[in-house]
C-alpha cells in the first residue's frame, strides 16, 4: 500500500490526493484492483480523446466499453473484464485465450461483437441488420457509448471525475515537459 501511495505521488505530484480519492486502498489487497481500474480508466480517457479528435476532423467515431466477464477454468475471471479481454470475442475465437471456457452467453457476445467489427471493417460503420444501434461518438459531453456486456446496450458517456482527473494529469504532464 505504501508503494502504491508513493507511486501516485511520484506520477501525479500535486494531483496525487485526487488520484488516491478516486482509487482508494485500505490494504495491500486493494492495490491490484485499484491499479487495474486506474489503468482501464486512463485507457478510457485516451479512447475518448481520440474519438473527439476524429469527430472534430469530420470523421465518424464509435466508442465502446467491454464489460463481459469471461470464464477462466470454468469460473468468472476474478480480474473482471480487463484490457484486451475482448480480443477473442471480437474475432469470434473461442480458443483465443488459454484456460478460457465459453458459455452460450459468450458465444452470443462473440457473434455480436464480431458482426460489429466486420461491419465496421467493410463500411466504416459497425451497425448492421439484427444488431442494436451503435451511436457515433461526437463530444466529451452528451455522447453515448456502446457497452458490450452480456447484451449490448447504449449508455451516456458524460464526463466523470475520473475523466476530469486524467485531463488535468495530462495537462500537468504537458506543462512539465515544456519547462
Predicted regions and their residues:
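Substrate-gating cap/lid region and adjacent catalytic-acid/histidine neighborhood
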Residues: 1-104, 116, 123
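Short secondary-structure transition/capping segments
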Residues: 63-66, 110-115, 173-178
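Short, solvent-exposed polar/charged micro-motifs at secondary-structure junctions
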Residues: 72-77, 142, 156-158
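A structural signal for short secondary-structure junctions
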Residues: 81-82, 111, 138-140
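Short, flexible active-site recognition loops that position polar ligands and cofactors
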Residues: 102-103, 107, 156-160
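Non-catalytic, well-ordered alpha-helical segments in soluble enzyme domains
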Residues: 106-129
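Mature extracytoplasmic/periplasmic domains
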Residues: 123, 127-156
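Tryptophan-rich aromatic "cage" segments
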Residues: 151-179
Amino acid at each position: 500500500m505504501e508503494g502504491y501511495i508513493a507511486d501516485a505521488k511520484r506520477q501525479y505530484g500535486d494531483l496525487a490526493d485526487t488520484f488516491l480519492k478516486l482509487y482508494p486502498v485500505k490494504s495491500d489487497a486493494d492495490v491490484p484492483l485499484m491499479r487495474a481500474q486506474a489503468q482501464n480508466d486512463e485507457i478510457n480517457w485516451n479512447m475518448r480523446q481520440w474519438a473527439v479528435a476524429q469527430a472534430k476532423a469530420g470523421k465518424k467515431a464509435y466508442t465502446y466499453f467491454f464489460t463481459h466477464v469471461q470464464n477462466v477454468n470454468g469460473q468468472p475471471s476474478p480480474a473482471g473484464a480487463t484490457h484486451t479481454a475482448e480480443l477473442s470475442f471480437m474475432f469470434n475465437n473461442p480458443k483465443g485465450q488459454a484456460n478460457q471456457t465459453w458459455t452460450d452467453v459468450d458465444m452470443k457476445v462473440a457473434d455480436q461483437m464480431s458482426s460489429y467489427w466486420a461491419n465496421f471493417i467493410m463500411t466504416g460503420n459497425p451497425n448492421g441488420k439484427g444488431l442494436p444501434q451503435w451511436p457515433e461518438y461526437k463530444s466529451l459531453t452528451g455522447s453515448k457509448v456502446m457497452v458490450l456486456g452480456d447484451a449490448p446496450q447504449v449508455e451516456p458517456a458524460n464526463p466523470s471525475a475520473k475523466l476530469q482527473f486524467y485531463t488535468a494529469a495530462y495537462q500537468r504532464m504537458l506543462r512539465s515537459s515544456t519547462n
